[in-house]
Regions:
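Transmembrane beta-barrel domains of Gram-negative outer membranes and organellar outer membranes
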Residues: 1-109, 127-129, 191-193
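Transmembrane beta-barrel strands of outer-membrane/channel proteins
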Residues: 18-22, 61-67, 101-105, 140-146, ...
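A short, structural micro-pattern
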Residues: 95, 114-116, 136
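Extracellular loop and loop/strand-boundary signature of outer-membrane beta-barrel proteins
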Residues: 107, 152-154, 209
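Glycine-rich phosphate-binding "P-loop"
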Residues: 135-165
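Feature captures outer-membrane beta-barrel proteins of Gram-negative bacteria and organelles
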Residues: 42-54, 79-93, 116-131, 142, ...
Length: 229
């Protein structure tokens, strides 16, 4: 929740996700504050996979639409966005790990940040209690990246120095998981829900819990769907 993992899509995979964020202090369903400033917004991401991370290298191409809600008739749906690429490899026989590199925004338009987000990341799958009935399947992730993973110091100084990010997620019920992460400048935590037998997933949480970043604490609601053709 709040950071990328080293896992990704493969050939014939297609995915789409929609996210909603709202200022924590203003409330979950407050779109504009008393000064008519936008304090909530939606975003969208969609793309497709190629290759095979088990046999060779897998990859995905994704497009991100930054804003779905206009501000004074400007910066509405599709006005700002990015397109990027991710390459990833699975190593099931080597501690069940995955590795990936990504450049999330080589293509930018509108008010998208001009700083490049490039990262390398490793994720490891494991079970907290492998011999128990309730195994608590887990995913541990650690990476280094620029752009959205910069420290607050780098953001204030307008530099693009690399920074460390990481997170941990655990399945606490058959269809419920909990995850927490540090994205380089903010602490995030949330729950993942998979209520159906088809790949429609939801996550609900709070980003920047400690209000360490410039955005402050925000509610986050995300839904994603993927399929193979």
């Amino acid at each position: 929740f709040g950071i990328p993992s080293a896992m990704g899509s493969s050939w014939k995979d297609v995915f789409v996700s929609v996210a909603y964020t709202a200022d924590y202090d203003e409330g979950l369903f407050t779109w504009y504050d008393k000064n008519n400033k936008k304090v909530a917004d939606g975003s969208m991401n969609f793309g497709f996979g190629f290759g095979d991370p088990n046999e060779s290298i897998g990859g995905e191409i994704s497009v991100g639409i930054i804003s779905l809600l206009s501000q004074k008739g400007e910066s509405g749906f599709g006005a700002d966005g990015t397109a990027g690429i991710k390459l990833h490899k699975s190593f099931p026989s080597f501690l069940n790990t995955h590795a990936a590199i990504s450049w999330t925004n080589p293509i930018k338009w509108g008010e998208a940040t001009k700083k490049d987000t490039v990262y390398g990341v490793i994720s490891k799958e494991f079970e907290l209690r492998p011999d128990a009935d309730k195994k608590f399947a887990s995913l541990l992730t650690l990476g280094v990246g620029t752009g959205s993973h910069r420290s607050n110091t780098a953001i204030k100084e307008n530099t693009n120095d690399p920074n460390i990010f990481g997170g941990y997620g655990v399945q606490i019920l058959p269809r419920v998981s909990f995850a927490s992460s540090w994205n380089g400048n903010a602490l995030n935590a949330g729950f993942g829900l998979s209520p159906f037998d088809f790949p429609l997933n939801f996550s609900l949480g709070i980003s920047d819990i400690t209000e360490n970043s410039t955005n402050g604490a925000q509610f986050n609601i995300n839904t994603g769907y993927s399929f193979r053709f």
